[in-house]
């Protein structure tokens, strides 16, 4: 959310106060006789306004979005309709985002030591051309910004591969509701206790859809989905009714091809109605649930309350103000500096990540989130979700201080364009930034006696976190980018939210999941996450090498047994020369380190000044290659893949992935199939993490987070002469005044004194704020 520009002479402390008020972070009032902590006006430097002249990595501003709209609506050949008039068979703008210049131009601009013109800004705009014959999705590059005068076609995509959108959802929902209610109203009411139309407080609804693309149906150009029926109570995903319809969409023509009910398939709604009139037809009765606080699917406080009294939980405080700054989507923290932005389709991305002003990563970006379910009935059997097609970035909004992020975090809005609004939409609290004491230590050691001691030295593990949370239907995903003081960059993902269970039957008992209550099976599913890591270690000419740890068979000189041998481990340097050699599938019998470096730069000791990539979230996909939808997500085959960077291979996935084909819009296999040289080239590491989730009763109502976090790390490896965090003012050293005579006492070396703080932590006013503005957290139409 934007703030007014600072007037000349305005006290910076007041600006900090205004920032915190707008963010719902704190209230500078007296509480129980003690004042809340003062904010250091020197440290609090965040500016969350939109720039008039955006930096190169900054998202499109609202001014730029509006100017692109105005320009395109004047292009008569596009025949664009405004939101509200658009239908799936018309031409309308689906969305737009920043289109980055060529990397070489960006690097030249960033590294130039003389004034250099900034590469012109541009937008990539997605237009649904339902008005064409055949219908098509067209992407255009519109430039230069902020006042565009030109556009060029970027690519065309078959219309049946278009991502899900509000215009289509509304049309499909209306069609399904009327068709099914018109033929099966009595059947639905007697079987599931509710209706689709005029339902009062006993409503049924088609809430979820399992895409069935050409690679599944083996029908070229087909766009189909299984739509599941649920009882519409909180939360509807936990109230399936074992009824689904397979719908085929060709242009604006909708056809119901199959109906599934009670382990039976039918060719039409009329066939179901005909069989239902037969007294011998197998009945299924699922009573409509009574909505109450005790309902198992409801996220309301219940059970044995704890703690015994309502005592507030602990929280962190910044006693002397924030130690980071945010301005124009650039964050500065200790020795770190980076830019961040949001892709409406693919989610959060970081750029120009520097440590001690040395470029480490040019781009770190989420590529896709995939969930593959298993089940006995078609909605789960074919539930292969590519979340990019549901627009990962558009679903960032409404993080709650004190729960989703610390109360004192800096909350940042994003502006995007959707097909349902002429004005740019504000995603309130799309990001948060905060510094956090993890409760661990970065390093520590105590030596209690001589000759080394006595001494103690330790540094708390303090990190900066940039967080985004996306909610795709039933699941919530926390995406953290974590910056450690010693030059380590961590990327973490944590899934939570509601599972998608199926109705319990004898056919699916124990095969696809455990029985959770008297009517549900918690279906097995596989979460997978792919990230792009464009690594630039001392420039763009890098090498990828694995340090293979192998067995060393050597002599055993102290053994009395003749010819005895001794086994230990040794390092084998393995330079990966081609892309096919750089495809990594974890093998427990072959431990290794993955390092990236510039061969032209060595440390004083002669070592390669490298960064190590550590994947601690690995998960193996068991699906045969190119089976079903597997080929659309070929990146899931490898836990790490390293390729030569190309401007034509910018993402491993796309928003066109849901309806899988044998030839997807982005085919990741093509990235390495040409097997190019990767020695001394600009390299990209594609990192895949994942976890198999077998739901259990404790996943009701919502999956908890402990044990589900997945992380990968970029860590300096002979890059610095010593620990770069040795200069941390957060360190504490305790030693004897005279190590030979402890009775003379000890001395303590520390430079921060939070124990002197006598004020209380700021009290957030967020909940008062949203009482008046519920759209901050919810979509209010």
UniProtKB/Swiss-Prot annotation:
Q: Which InterPro entries match?
A: Cu_Am_Ox_Cu-bd, Cu_Am_ox_TPQ-bd, Cu_amine_oxidase, Cu_amine_oxidase_C, Cu_amine_oxidase_C_sf, Cu_amine_oxidase_N-reg, Cu_amine_oxidase_N2
Recorded family membership: Belongs to the copper/topaquinone oxidase family.
Residues binding Cu cation, per UniProt: 525, 527, 693
Binding annotation for Mn(2+): 534, 536, 682
Q: What is this protein called?
A: Putative amine oxidase [copper-containing]
Cofactor note, please? Binds 1 copper ion per subunit. Binds 2 calcium ions per subunit.
| PANTHER family for the chain | AMINE OXIDASE, COPPER AMINE OXIDASE
The signal peptide here is 1-34
Can you list the GO cellular component terms from the UniProt entry? extracellular region; plasma membrane
Q: What is its EC number?
A: 1.4.3.-
- PTM (free text): Topaquinone (TPQ) is generated by copper-dependent autoxidation of a specific tyrosyl residue.
Q: Where are the transmembrane segments?
A: none
Q: Which residues form the active site?
A: 387 (proton acceptor), 475 (schiff-base intermediate with substrate)
Q: Which residues make up the binding site for Ca(2+) 1?
A: 534, 536, 682-683
- Residues reported to bind Ca(2+) 2: 579, 671, 674, 676
GO molecular function per UniProt: copper ion binding; primary methylamine oxidase activity; quinone binding
Disulfide pairs here are: 199-203, 405-432
Q: Which SUPFAM superfamilies match?
A: Amine oxidase catalytic domain, Amine oxidase N-terminal region
Q: What keywords tag this UniProt record?
A: Calcium, Copper, Disulfide bond, Manganese, Metal-binding, Oxidoreductase, Secreted, Signal, TPQ
Residues binding substrate are: 385-395, 472-477
């Amino acid at each position: 959310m934007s703030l007014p520009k600072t007037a000349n002479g305005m006290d910076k402390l007041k600006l900090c106060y205004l920032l915190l008020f707008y963010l719902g972070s704190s209230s500078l009032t007296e509480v129980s006789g003690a004042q809340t902590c003062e904010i250091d006006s020197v440290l609090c430097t965040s500016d969350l306004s939109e720039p008039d002249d955006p930096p190169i990595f900054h998202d499109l501003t609202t001014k730029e979005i509006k100017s692109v709209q105005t320009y395109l609506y004047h292009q008569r050949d596009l025949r664009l309709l405004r939101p509200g008039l658009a239908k799936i068979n018309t031409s309308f703008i689906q969305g737009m985002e920043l289109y980055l210049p060529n990397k070489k131009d960006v690097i030249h601009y960033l590294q130039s030591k003389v004034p250099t013109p900034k590469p012109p800004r541009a937008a990539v705009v997605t237009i649904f051309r339902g008005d064409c014959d055949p219908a098509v999705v067209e992407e255009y590059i519109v430039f230069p910004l902020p006042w565009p005068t030109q556009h060029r076609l970027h690519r065309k995509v078959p219309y049946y591969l278009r991502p899900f959108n509000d215009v289509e959802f509304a049309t499909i929902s209306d069609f399904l509701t009327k068709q099914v209610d018109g033929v099966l109203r009595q059947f639905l009411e007697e079987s599931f206790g509710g209706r689709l139309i005029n339902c009062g407080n006993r409503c049924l609804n088609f809430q979820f859809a399992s895409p069935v693309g050409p690679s599944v149906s083996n029908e070229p150009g087909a766009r189909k989905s299984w739509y599941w029926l649920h009882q519409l109570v909180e939360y509807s995903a936990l109230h399936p009714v074992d009824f689904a319809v397979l719908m085929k969409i060709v242009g604006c023509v909708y056809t119901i091809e199959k109906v599934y009910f009670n382990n039976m398939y039918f060719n039409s709604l009329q066939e179901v109605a005909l069989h239902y009139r037969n007294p011998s037809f197998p009945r299924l009765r699922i009573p409509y649930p009574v909505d109450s606080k005790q309902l198992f699917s409801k996220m309301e406080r219940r059970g044995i309350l704890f703690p015994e009294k309502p005592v507030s939980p602990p929280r962190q405080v910044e006693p002397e103000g924030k130690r980071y700054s945010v301005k124009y989507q650039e964050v500065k923290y200790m020795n770190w500096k980076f830019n961040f932005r949001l892709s409406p389709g693919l989610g959060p991305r970081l750029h120009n990540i520097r440590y001690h002003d040395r470029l480490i990563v040019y781009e770190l970006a989420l590529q896709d989130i995939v969930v593959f379910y298993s089940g006995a009935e078609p909605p789960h059997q074919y539930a292969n979700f590519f979340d990019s097609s549901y627009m990962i970035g558009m679903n960032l909004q409404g993080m709650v201080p004190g729960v989703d992020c610390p109360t004192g975090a800096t909350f940042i809005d994003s502006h995007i364009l959707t097909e349902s609004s002429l004005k740019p939409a504000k995603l309130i609290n799309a990001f948060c930034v905060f510094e956090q004491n993890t409760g661990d230590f970065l390093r520590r050691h105590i030596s209690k006696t001589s000759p080394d001691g006595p001494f103690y030295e330790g540094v708390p593990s303090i990190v900066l976190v940039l967080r985004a949370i996306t909610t795709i239907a039933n699941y919530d995903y926390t995406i953290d980018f974590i910056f450690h003081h010693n030059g380590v960059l961590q990327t973490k993902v944590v899934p939570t939210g509601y599972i998608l269970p199926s109705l319990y039957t004898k056919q699916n008992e124990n095969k696809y999941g455990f029985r959770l209550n008297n009517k549900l099976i918690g279906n097995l599913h596989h979460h997978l996450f792919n990230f792009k890591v464009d690594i630039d270690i001392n420039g763009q000419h890098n090498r990828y090498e694995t340090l293979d740890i192998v067995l060393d068979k050597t002599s055993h000189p102290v053994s009395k047994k003749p010819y005895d041998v001794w086994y230990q481990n040794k390092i084998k340097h393995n330079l990966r020369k081609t892309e096919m050699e750089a495809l990594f599938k974890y093998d427990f019998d072959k431990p290794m380190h993955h390092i990236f470096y510039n061969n032209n730069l060595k440390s004083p000791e002669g070592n390669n000044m490298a960064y190590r990539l550590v994947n601690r979230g690995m998960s193996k996909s068991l699906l045969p290659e190119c089976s079903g939808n597997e080929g659309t997500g070929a990146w899931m085959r490898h836990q790490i893949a390293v390729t030569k960077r190309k401007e034509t291979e910018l993402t491993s996935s796309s928003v066109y992935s849901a309806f899988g084909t044998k030839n997807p819009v982005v085919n990741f296999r093509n990235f390495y199939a040409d097997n190019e040289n990767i020695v001394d080239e600009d390299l990209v590491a594609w990192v895949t993490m994942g976890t198999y989730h077998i739901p259990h009763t404790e996943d009701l109502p919502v999956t908890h987070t402990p044990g589900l976090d997945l992380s990968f790390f970029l860590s300096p490896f002979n890059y610095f002469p010593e620990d770069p965090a040795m200069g941390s003012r957060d360190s504490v050293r305790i030693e004897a005044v005279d190590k030979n005579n402890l009775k003379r006492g000890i001395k303590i070396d520390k430079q921060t004194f939070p124990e002197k703080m006598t004020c209380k932590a700021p009290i957030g006013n967020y909940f008062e704020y949203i009482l008046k503005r519920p759209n901050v957290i919810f979509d209010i139409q």
